[in-house]
């Protein structure tokens, strides 16, 4: 006589499914203390012989900032950007200086100067011809000695992106500084200082209450 198949306990299955969905719906910042801080970072930008430079934007950008090192998660909300040109009005500058913000690929990702240079051409456009990164500024050579400022909301990192990062928490961003198309009489030395860059970063971080 053939043995009848065991009946499934649908009640237990429903409990398992309910518990699984409940765990998935709990955000990773649940039970953590949320706070918003503003930090400021200032640096001089040099010509560096037509090389791109990558500055990683994250709460530890400034050595003595108010972001605790024990924070469980953080994200950048806004970047207030200001560039003061040191270039001489009489040097006959031609070309542009560009700043762009791109999402980092993960918490521990790093970008070298050479990689930043390749990113300028590789990541500017997607397959459909749409801009993938956020340009901050355009030409400044026509108005030297003037401030160039802008408030930028960084592009959101898509869910399910590389390194398994959820949303944009702890991923950070890179500011790519490109002076390759700028020429002038006072840029003969690759160490020539183009100007001063000031960044005010508004970020949210979550810490444990204990």
UniProtKB/Swiss-Prot annotation:
Subcellular compartments: Virion
Keywords: Capsid protein, T=1 icosahedral capsid protein, Virion
Primary location group: virion
Claim: Transferase is one of the keywords in the record: no
Region (Disordered), start-end ranges: 1-21
Superkingdom of the source species: Viruses
Keyword presence, GTP-binding: no
Composition bias type Basic residues, residue spans: 1-14
One cellular component (GO) term of this entry: T=1 icosahedral viral capsid
Stated role: Capsid protein self-assembles to form a baciliform capsid with a T=1 symmetry, about 18 nm in diameter. The capsid encapsulates three genomic RNAs (Potential).
Protein name per UniProt: Capsid protein
Source organism (scientific name): Ourmia melon virus (isolate Melon/Iran/VE9)
